[in-house]
């Protein structure tokens, strides 16, 4: 092998890696099926997590009924019932993609209230509420995707 062949093979290797690096750094838009599958996975994961929070509140209903925070001045029990409705029934609609944006409105209200009123807009104290809020806002904007009821 001459020096010229080694140099041209090295240049070819670099060019191939540049293409791969370019594809990695600047990927092409994904097709709608893979994006819809991603939205489905996000809906199922965050919806199930939200549903579990609602089940915990339903399970401890009698203890929480009188001590649940009431930031909207509608009563502790009504606030708790609204949160259980949002976290259980609306999360099922969220996961299924049925009446998607309509089912997200109570979920967004609960997370906005939790983050700004209960946790005082502190990311340190209200980290989970902030994560749910950001995911729900992005999902509200993007819609449920193709894999929805």
Regions found by a protein language model. Give the residues of each.
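Extended, low-polarity transmembrane helix blocks
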Residues: 5-59, 77-85, 92-149
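Perimembrane loop-to-helix junctions flanking transmembrane segments
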Residues: 64-77
């Amino acid at each position: 092998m001459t020096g010229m062949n080694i140099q041209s093979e090295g240049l070819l290797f670099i060019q191939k890696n540049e293409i791969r690096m370019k594809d990695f750094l600047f990927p092409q838009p994904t097709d709608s099926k893979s994006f819809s599958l991603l939205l489905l996975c996000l809906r199922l994961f965050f919806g199930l997590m939200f549903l579990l929070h609602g089940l915990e509140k339903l399970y401890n209903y009698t203890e929480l009924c009188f001590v649940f925070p009431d930031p909207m001045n509608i009563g502790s029990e009504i606030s708790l019932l609204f949160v259980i409705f949002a976290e259980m029934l609306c999360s099922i609609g969220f996961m299924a993609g049925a009446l998607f944006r309509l089912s997200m409105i109570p979920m967004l209200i609960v997370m906005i209230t939790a983050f700004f009123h209960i946790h005082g807009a502190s990311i340190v104290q209200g980290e989970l509420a902030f994560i749910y809020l950001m995911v729900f806002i992005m999902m509200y904007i993007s819609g449920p995707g193709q894999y929805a009821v």
